[in-house]
Amino acid sequence: MTGRIFTADHHVYDLPPLLSWNVRHTGTVPCDSWSVTAVYQPEMLTVLRMAAGFAAIENGMTQLRGIVDEYTVELGSRGMTVTLSGRGYAARLLDNESRPVTYEQVTLRELIRCHAEPYGISCGAAADLRPTVPYTAGAGISQWKVISEFCRTYGGFLPRFAKTGELLATPEQDSGKRIILDSGSPVLNCRIREDHYGVLTEARVIDKRQNVSYSVKNPEMIAKGGQCRRVIYTPGRSTWDAMRYTGEYQIQQSKKEEQAVTVTLPGSFGAFPGDRVTVRLEKLGLTGNYRVAETENRFSAREGAVMIWTLKECG
């Protein structure tokens, strides 16, 4: 893999051959992250001090665009090395707060123009969301929160980032691509985890102004003996639909980390968040269709190139 640096004064610099690297894709928040280590050369110092952007390039294809958060020069057992690390482009929106603002009527495109484009974010696709009610961005929230809450409330989805750094503000689509994992796949490690901690059995939504409440339950977790209730207060004049949606959303959010399959394979960049995987690992009792939620691609002289996929069951 090639690590390419973009400086604040618009110069491009390719790092020396990498000794090790790690690229993690989530597609959303927590945002993508990366780190690379290379042999340090004294002439690099000027570049490092101005390093602002990063691209991970594998076989001529960009696998990640991000920002540079830090660099470290070290004299150790491997000689003089430099390690750089940073995050994906979602960091540009997470690191910047919005001023308080209320839009009487606003489209998603207009929201992106005001809250994403000023921070160097280009939009690859945006849903045609045009709510007829006011939308308020409160004080102290990030630009990411402004856009993601709008998409969640009026579109029922969360925006994400392509590996090239473009914002994708549309519902995720199934590309039709299928990855097969079966007994013939070169699986180095596979782990199944189920964690009930924090999974809600009930979400009670209360509108204090109207003195009404709505309860949404999670029968699957109740059947497993779970007992975890949350009470959520909403702004006044909430509709029954809005209250039900809020309760269902809280339960779905609590279930996101309940089950996960982690698979380690040789190679790099074989999957990306959103890809679909058909699993047929009968020895583990593991079969079904899964969505790639997160990937980690790493390389070192000791273990070579490996990729770790975190899979979640397709809903």
Which residues fall in each region the model found?
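Envelope-exposed proteins and targeting segments
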Residues: D32, L64, M80-V82, K163-E166, ...
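Amphipathic, non-transmembrane alpha-helical segments in extracytoplasmic/periplasmic proteins
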Residues: V36, G86, P100-C123, G138-A162, ...
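Acidic, small/polar-enriched beta strand-loop surface segments
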Residues: M1-R4, N59, S148, K163, ...
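Oligomerization/assembly interface segments of phage tail-like spikes and tubes
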Residues: H25-P42, G79-Y89, V205, E257-L265, ...
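Short intrinsically disordered coil segments
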Residues: M50-G53, R99-Q105, S183-N189, E220-M221, ...
